[in-house]
Amino acid sequence: MSDTDELLEATTALILPLLHALDALNQAGRLMHPPALQEVVSAIGPYRDPLEEGRQVFTQVQWPEHLEAFTLHANMATTLALRAFDGFASAMDQAEPPMAAYRAMGLATQAYAAAYPLAAMLPPMNRFYLENDAREDEELQRKLMEADTEQPNVGVMHADNASDQRGGFSVYVPEYYQGETLPLVVALHGGSGHGRQFLWSWLRAV
């Protein structure tokens, strides 16, 4: 097997189960309702082990230096997703299961954020950050994949909005933005949330 084939095999081994895992965690967030917590936990449980198996394959490969950013974000997203699954799995054994599940949802949100840079590298990951009906929009996907993500003031940005800060904001500007007039969408998360995480609940819609 050539080095290229080995890298492709390792990428496939991880990215497909990672996508399935992120989709499952996203669905868990949508369906999260304390009386139905056990049902949610049972539904997403089967997606954890394939992700762990993919991670084992992925981390056994010697990755070249120019793919450092790719491997960094893939590993970060995988680790956070696995922690989210474990958080959901153990939630029913905690003193306050709903609160434990909400903490797991926070880890899932961090996994979405960690995986986002992969959207500019891999079309399947790009589609994950689109609404279902937009996943068939080839023109939109082309614009996103061809966009210059290094240009200033596009993508996901945070202003005084680290996880331990209050009073700041997070903003998303489509990576294909070229100065044209675009609508402004303002989303408020409420007093108990944090904008840095809340952004990932509405990014697909914009």
Question: Which ranges hold each PLM region?
Answer:
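Short substrate-entry loop that stabilizes the transition state in hydrolases
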Residues: 176-206
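A domain-start/cap signature at the N-terminus of enzymes
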Residues: 1-53, 60, 66-182
